[in-house]
Amino acid sequence: MRRFIFMSLGLLVLAFSLSGIGANQNCPSGWFPHNISCYKLFTERKNWDQAQRTCMEEQENGQLASITDADTAVKLSNKLSGNWNFFDIWFGLSLSKTRGFWLWPDGSMVTFTNWGKGEPNNFWDMESCAALTAASGYLSWNDKNCGLLHYFICQTQSRGG
């Protein structure tokens, strides 16, 4: 009986320890998890509209990433700065020409920002898309011309979220 209890406890401990392996099992292959979302960096250079379209085609409910809090900003910065440090990266923030303020791809209002110093400046009235800046380690944001070609980061909901 003692041996049975000991073996049962051992198997239980093993099961719990293995449950943490493959923690991104709720994300598609090649995507990394954070909170209830999955993210993927695309290293093809596209303009903002092409990047958004690629995100939508890549995954159901896919879109350019929304950075809605400091925790997500830091997580993405840490993940991205470990891989790339010379190209800015499109994410999902864009200036609504009709409404005159910044919106996420799903149309929701911005409640958290991390603009770089002096940004957004809408330089020459031609900057209505946002990018994570390489110079800041992908932590701060810069408004840019939507037609420029950059890497981009997509987001989708995790299967468990």
From Swiss-Prot:
Expressed by the venom gland. Residues 34-155 form the C-type lectin domain. Keywords: Calcium, Disulfide bond, Glycoprotein, Lectin, Metal-binding, Secreted, Signal. It is found in: Secreted. SUPFAM superfamilies: C-type lectin-like. Transmembrane segments: none annotated. A motif (Mannose-binding) lies at residues 117-119. Pfam families: Lectin_C (PF00059). It comes from the Eukaryota. Residues 1-23 form the signal peptide. CDD domains: CLECT. Belongs to the true venom lectin family. This is C-type lectin lectoxin-Lio3. It comes from Erythrolamprus poecilogyrus.
